[in-house]
Amino acid sequence: MKEPLKIGLMDSGMGGLSVLKELLKYDSELEIVYYGDLKNSPYGEKDASEVLELVRSVCNFLQKENVSAILLACNTATSAAAQTLRKEFSIPIFGMEPAIKPAILQNPGKKVALLATPVTQREEKLQRLKSELKAEELVLSISCPGLAGLVDQGDFDKAEKYLRPILANLQEQDVENLVLGCTHYVFLKQIILKNFPNVKIYDGNSGTIKHLLNSLQVPRVILNGSQNNRSIYKLILNSEKEFHFRLASKLLSLKE
């Protein structure tokens, strides 16, 4: 019997669980190891060099778990580490891409707001993407220090208070398209829609998972409601707080 393909996913904390949920929508017989580096979260306000070291350490751990590929299910980790680690590891390293391209192409000439961590906003990867799309004038970059940390704490009331003035300001500027440039923020979609009902939200999870499965030559068949998922996953959270394990379970079971 053929062994299932083993894939490693990593994030600074809970955000990558939104990517894991996307992966579990497919009828793909996978063995998934998820590592949440909560001990060192959040990544988004650290220096890029420190993030690189943290991500390298997690990837070394995942390689010892005998994974065949690693997905950095974290925009900050991707921005700071993906390019370097692809040269260091013999297995494929995949990363996240903010969904700026579909947002720009589907709304020609219209402004697009990008919510992301300070590291993601600063790094060359994002500047290069905006330049390739000739979208420097159209992308309104909004740095959100501390917001991912509120998701890791499960403090969605504080997250809503944090987002309200940002969303109100976007409505005043007639910005109708919002890109979530951090996998943590995907868990805030309902809060965003509650405060900004007409906004069109884009995130990179679906495109990333399609690219991952295509690259690994895994069939992309969406599960229907009655099918059982044949993939199995293991959650590793380097946290001593039982709360984090309960929160992870809650986030994985959230309806979209």
From Swiss-Prot:
EC number: 5.1.1.3
GO BP of this protein: cell wall organization; peptidoglycan biosynthetic process; regulation of cell shape
Cell wall biogenesis/degradation in keyword set: yes
Name of the top EC class for this enzyme: isomerase
The keyword Isomerase appears for this protein: yes
Annotated substrate binding sites: 11-12, 43-44, 75-76, 183-184
Pathway in which the depicted protein is active: Cell wall biogenesis; peptidoglycan biosynthesis
Reaction(s) this enzyme catalyzes, per UniProt: L-glutamate = D-glutamate
A Pfam match: Asp_Glu_race
Entry function: Provides the (R)-glutamate required for cell wall biosynthesis.
Similarity section: Belongs to the aspartate/glutamate racemases family.
Name of the protein in question: Glutamate racemase
UniProt source species: Leptospira interrogans serogroup Icterohaemorrhagiae serovar copenhageni (strain Fiocruz L1-130)
Higher taxonomy: Bacteria, Pseudomonadati, Spirochaetota, Spirochaetia, Leptospirales
